[in-house]
């Protein structure tokens, strides 16, 4: 059961789609419950490049994101429309849905990707005072980072909470360099909020004229607004592309850049996930053996290690530090093959099939 608009540019929708595909691929019947939101004129399975299809049930009443009272009503009607008496297992990210499933004693897995601070008062009351996460109907609680696990163990959960970092579903392929490129293609994929470091990429591109920069993400309007103040020709903007097109675009990139700021906002440019983030795109970069240049945020150290599988920038607010590393890479990218290979091997082993198998193992 998912609350997310689908298909859409939201990472949560992509992760849910790929999870359902993997469960279907290993032989289980899947019914995904969704609100009637998202880019409904586009084919869901084509948008996410899904080969192993599954049933989708849309609740027509909810033609916009379920909020307020509709948040609670959506959970209730989702379970009702799922033919709950015949379902063996549920998976959800929604606290209230988990609460209702526990009330009717339906076994389920609860995935947590965010801090509880973004939830409403009633949900906080359910978790902190009623201890709903300790209910026996929850077979497993999964967080995407150790920092998030530590946050929730404060509410008394110990035995059934595990960490499963996000994982990529892309085909694994590592680019080989037979000679050093004259110009590096440096790429960013994702939201173009300032917290994701778009201003830093623009600033770097203006100074570093020897390389090309590519930004994939945001709406056409957002891109037009940004380009008004840019005159250099070595930076290229493209609006959000469907996941089915990511592999091809990413294959042409040499260095993937993630210049996060100390505060990382989410959809709507709100909140702060800098302590708990596990970016899905990071694992896509690794799966294709890309050299990753990233801000050194503590939470990312759960997966990224400086000069082992990535290059991490400590003083990430200073463009000179980024330029210094880019200059070193430009001199000889082959020198970084060992770092790229380490990232590639990790993502190849810990792919979305591996993650799904761990999720469903009891």
Regions found by a protein language model. Name each.
Residues 1, 142, 168, 179-196, ...:
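Conserved donor-binding/catalytic core segment of Leloir-type glycosyltransferases
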Residues 171, 317, 321, 331-362:
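A charged, aromatic-enriched C-terminal amphipathic alpha-helix characteristic of glycosyltransferases
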Residues 215-217, 224-255, 265, 307:
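Nucleotide-activated donor-binding/catalytic signature segment of Leloir-type glycosyltransferases, i.e.
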């Amino acid at each position: 059961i998912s609350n997310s608009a689908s298909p859409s540019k939201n990472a949560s929708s992509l992760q849910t789609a790929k999870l359902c595909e993997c469960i279907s691929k290993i032989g289980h019947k899947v019914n995904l419950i969704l609100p009637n939101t998202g880019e409904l004129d586009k084919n869901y399975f084509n948008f996410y490049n899904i080969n192993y299809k599954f049933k989708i049930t849309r609740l027509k009443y909810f033609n916009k994101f379920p909020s307020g009272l509709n948040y609670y009503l959506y959970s209730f009607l989702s379970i009702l429309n799922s033919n709950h008496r015949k379902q063996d297992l549920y998976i959800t990210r929604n606290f209230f849905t988990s609460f209702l499933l526990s009330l009717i004693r339906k076994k389920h897995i609860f995935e947590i990707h965010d801090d509880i601070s973004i939830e409403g008062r009633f949900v906080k009351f359910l978790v902190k005072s009623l201890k709903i996460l300790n209910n026996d109907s929850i077979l497993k609680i999964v967080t995407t980072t150790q920092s998030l696990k530590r946050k929730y163990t404060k509410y008394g959960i110990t035995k059934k909470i595990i960490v499963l970092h996000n994982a990529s579903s892309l085909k694994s392929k590592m680019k080989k360099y037979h000679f050093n490129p004259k110009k590096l293609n440096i790429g960013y994929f994702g939201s173009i909020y300032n917290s994701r470091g778009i201003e830093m990429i623009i600033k770097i591109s203006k100074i570093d004229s020897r390389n090309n920069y590519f930004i994939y993400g945001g709406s056409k309007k957002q891109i037009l607004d940004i380009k008004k103040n840019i005159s250099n020709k070595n930076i290229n903007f493209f609006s959000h592309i469907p996941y089915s097109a990511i592999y091809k675009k990413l294959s042409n990139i040499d260095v993937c850049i993630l210049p996060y700021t100390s505060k990382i906002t989410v959809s709507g440019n709100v909140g702060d996930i800098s302590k708990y983030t596990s970016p899905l795109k990071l694992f896509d970069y690794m799966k294709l053996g890309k050299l990753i240049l990233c801000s050194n945020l503590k939470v990312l150290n759960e997966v990224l290690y400086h000069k082992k599988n990535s290059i991490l920038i400590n003083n990430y607010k200073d463009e000179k530090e980024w330029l210094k590393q880019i200059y070193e890479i430009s001199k000889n990218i082959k020198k970084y093959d060992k770092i790229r290979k380490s990232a590639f091997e990790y993502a190849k082993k810990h792919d979305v099939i591996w993650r799904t198998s761990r999720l469903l193992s009891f």
